[in-house]
Amino acid sequence: MLLAFDVGNTNIVMGVFKGKKLLHSFRISTDKNKTYDEYGMLVNQLIGYNGISLTEIDDVIISSVVPPLMNTLQVMSLKYFRTKPIVVGPGIKTGINIKYDNPKEVGADRIVNAVAAYELYGGPVIVIDFGTATTFCAISEKGEYLGGIIAPGLMISADALFQRTAKLPKIDLTKPPTVINRNTVASMQSGIIYGHVGMVDYIVTRMKGEFAPSAYVVATGGFANMIAEESKTIDTVNEMLTLEGLRIIYERNKE
């Protein structure tokens, strides 16, 4: 079995694959202060709850945008799973030609998403990932990573309003039924969520105009379904896109 780690700034998403089939997925909070033993015990508990033992994990692959955790998870993999993990980074085979000015600047998560989207949906394709940041990636018909956009995510927007104002409260991001609202919390929720929908549709329209009017649009990440319900430009939501991308990259790099 393959254990895949998608390490984001807010959450770590893990997936257990048997061949091409995703058996289980888990989401935990990202904590840079946890040791490799703490992560090892936590992962053991999560997979064990689903009837999988440590010895059944043959390989590990890691994608991380949190540098301090990379070594932690690598050591954890060696100690608890007795395997050297594949790490998404320079030198890894992705099948994607990155056209960024400096390819090393592209986050591992964006590369993984691009690989999955092109493999599953073909090109041209646009990937929107609703994470700590909301990112947009453009992949050409030939599978070239053309670039994209990085915007503040929904939680960052909510936190900024709370932290940078004297009277606005901290809120949960639930969608109000109307855009116009009569209380502060719902008004903030409306501005952040419906404002994000407007941003998404405008940016996707501009992206299509710049590189491919027929581009397919796939969304992923924690808020993807909520935004897709209101968006006029998102074609599909794939919550497991990043994990699928890790599986594909693993298959292209396993010995």
Swiss-Prot record:
<feature type="active site" description="Proton acceptor">
    <location>
        <position position="109"/>
    </location>
</feature>
<dbReference type="Pfam" id="PF03309">
    <property type="entry name" value="Pan_kinase"/>
</dbReference>
<feature type="binding site">
    <location>
        <position position="184"/>
    </location>
    <ligand>
        <name>substrate</name>
    </ligand>
</feature>
<dbReference type="GO" id="GO:0015937">
    <property type="term" value="P:coenzyme A biosynthetic process"/>
</dbReference>
<comment type="subunit">
    <text>Homodimer.</text>
</comment>
<keyword id="KW-0808">Transferase</keyword>
<keyword id="KW-0547">Nucleotide-binding</keyword>
<comment type="pathway">
    <text>Cofactor biosynthesis; coenzyme A biosynthesis; CoA from (R)-pantothenate: step 1/5.</text>
</comment>
<comment type="function">
    <text>Catalyzes the phosphorylation of pantothenate (Pan), the first step in CoA biosynthesis.</text>
</comment>
<dbReference type="InterPro" id="IPR043129">
    <property type="entry name" value="ATPase_NBD"/>
</dbReference>
<feature type="binding site">
    <location>
        <position position="129"/>
    </location>
    <ligand>
        <name>K(+)</name>
    </ligand>
</feature>
<keyword id="KW-0630">Potassium</keyword>
<dbReference type="GO" id="GO:0046872">
    <property type="term" value="F:metal ion binding"/>
</dbReference>
<keyword id="KW-0418">Kinase</keyword>
<dbReference type="InterPro" id="IPR004619">
    <property type="entry name" value="Type_III_PanK"/>
</dbReference>
<keyword id="KW-0173">Coenzyme A biosynthesis</keyword>
<keyword id="KW-0067">ATP-binding</keyword>
<keyword id="KW-0963">Cytoplasm</keyword>
<feature type="binding site">
    <location>
        <position position="132"/>
    </location>
    <ligand>
        <name>ATP</name>
    </ligand>
</feature>
<feature type="binding site">
    <location>
        <begin position="6"/>
        <end position="13"/>
    </location>
    <ligand>
        <name>ATP</name>
    </ligand>
</feature>
<feature type="binding site">
    <location>
        <position position="100"/>
    </location>
    <ligand>
        <name>substrate</name>
    </ligand>
</feature>
<dbReference type="GO" id="GO:0004594">
    <property type="term" value="F:pantothenate kinase activity"/>
</dbReference>
<dbReference type="GO" id="GO:0005737">
    <property type="term" value="C:cytoplasm"/>
</dbReference>
<comment type="similarity">
    <text>Belongs to the type III pantothenate kinase family.</text>
</comment>
<keyword id="KW-0479">Metal-binding</keyword>
<protein>
    <recommendedName>
        <fullName>Type III pantothenate kinase</fullName>
        <ecNumber>2.7.1.33</ecNumber>
    </recommendedName>
</protein>
<dbReference type="GO" id="GO:0005524">
    <property type="term" value="F:ATP binding"/>
</dbReference>
<feature type="binding site">
    <location>
        <begin position="107"/>
        <end position="110"/>
    </location>
    <ligand>
        <name>substrate</name>
    </ligand>
</feature>
